[in-house]
């Protein structure tokens, strides 16, 4: 029920904000559709730094240094009745606290390429390819002297291909719907694959605990896919980007994978800005160990707040 409510809230939020497009925006968008063909490129890069230094501090605490970087790029082509949209989002963050080793706080690779051919009015026949992964290994730290590797580049990696309809009423909002989607989960690490991480088939052992077959490194699913994207200046110097992705495996349509990302960029001047980013994930095939020892699918949530240097181009 929580999952359904979160999904409905996400869709309502995106559609509601999209409906608030002003007449000026509509006029500008209409003009660009009629007159502008060719490439449109741009992006944003930001670097946030937080540092705490303590000397003889009676209240206690630890020195710390945190760095978070974000790069978001797009390159879109419009030519006649054809469109080709490409986007790349990269994020990385590290934390050094006290005498602990450097730990990762953020790591993201997200690439999407979508080609469309106009069908009627604001609808396009379209094909989409999406790739998600991370750059470096990820760990958890059960105690000060132990760390367990949980992930790595292509462990997991997600490759999704979809064919469907793309709704593009204006540049602010975009909705892609596909009844024909292939989702491939890649776990290119045998230890993680043997453990059945990220939903792949785990290794099999006989009664003497001798390995019979190794865990599968690839899992393929077929289902339906929805992707809603909103990019809007909600106030002067405040930009909102929201992306909602839903995938339902036809073999078990009652469980919907959810990926909802939000980025709010608040500009102070040409270079200084504050950013707030959140990501909510639910995947029924991923089991997560709770602090109380229970294992099962859980709603994952991440938020990153930072103030630093940014540049929009």
Give the role of each language-model region:
Residues 47-53, 79-81, 90-96, 131-137, ...:
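Transmembrane beta-strands of outer-membrane beta-barrel pores
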Residues 43, 47-49, 69-77, 111-117, ...:
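Residues on the lipid-exposed face of transmembrane beta-strands in outer-membrane beta-barrel proteins
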Residues 54-59, 98-102, 138-145, 187-194, ...:
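Outer-membrane beta-barrel translocator domains and adjoining extracellular loop/strand segments
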Residues 55-61, 96-101, 145-151, 208-216, ...:
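Extracellular loop and loop/strand-boundary signature of outer-membrane beta-barrel proteins
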Residues 15-44:
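Sec-dependent signal peptide cleavage junction
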Residues 299-313:
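Outer-membrane beta-barrel "beta-signal"
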Residues 104-223:
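Outer-membrane pore/translocation modules
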Residues 82-84, 122-125, 172-175, 237-240, ...:
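Repeated loop/turn-to-beta-strand initiation elements of outer-membrane beta-barrel proteins
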